[in-house]
């Protein structure tokens, strides 16, 4: 996660600001790779969707996901679109949690835009329509209506490109101090 505030990348006190994916959306949810329980990432990332699909296949429940040797979020989205009820439930759950995370970010920061990247964003309209529906239900009307929710232009490569850009772009000026001076102190 990240934010641009007043034209500057906001990093926070320890340079870990806005890790929205590691905010808790379900205190009883699965353990995230960060160690926390019920993080947004553990509930709605492509990895989380694939994990839920694999769990469904390992049970006695009837699902078209069983025809795949390997299950990624792509297969779960594909079968949900084809009408598989198990896959639809997995996707609906994941996107509802994503919507809750976005609604929390909107309620906290009142941004003019939320950009969603990563693999899940490649699923397209179903992601953005569901997230917007959850945001409209959970945010003040004025905030929900004034915040644009859009896919990242870099798609699933956004994180890698952002990390490389931070490593190679000239030092940023942050409140009168050179960003590189502040980071390397």
Which residues does each predicted region cover?
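ATP-binding/phosphotransfer module of carbohydrate and carboxylate kinases, centering on a glycine-rich
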Residues: 9, 24-31, 36-185
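A short acidic/small-residue loop/turn micro-motif
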Residues: 16-19
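Short beta-strand scaffold segments in enzyme catalytic cores
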Residues: 1-4
């Amino acid at each position: 996660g990240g934010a641009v505030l007043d034209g500057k990348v906001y990093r926070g006190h320890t340079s870990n600001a806005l890790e929205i994916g590691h905010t808790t959306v379900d205190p009883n949810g699965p353990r995230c790779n960060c160690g926390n329980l019920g993080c947004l990432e553990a509930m709605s990332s492509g990895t989380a969707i694939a994990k839920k699909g694999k769990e469904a296949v390992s049970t006695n429940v009837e699902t078209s996901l069983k025809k795949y040797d390997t299950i990624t979020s792509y297969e779960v989205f594909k079968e949900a679109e084809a009408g598989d009820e198990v896959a639809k439930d997995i996707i609906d759950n994941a996107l509802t949690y994503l919507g809750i995370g976005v609604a929390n970010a909107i309620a906290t920061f009142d941004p003019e835009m939320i950009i969603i990247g990563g693999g899940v964003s490649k699923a397209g309209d179903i992601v953005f329509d569901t997230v917007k529906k959850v945001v409209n239900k959970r945010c003040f009307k004025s905030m929900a209506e004034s915040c644009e929710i859009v896919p990242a232009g870099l798609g699933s490569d956004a994180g890698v490109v952002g990390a490389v850009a931070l490593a190679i772009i000239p030092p940023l000026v942050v409140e009168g101090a050179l960003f590189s001076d502040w980071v390397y102190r």
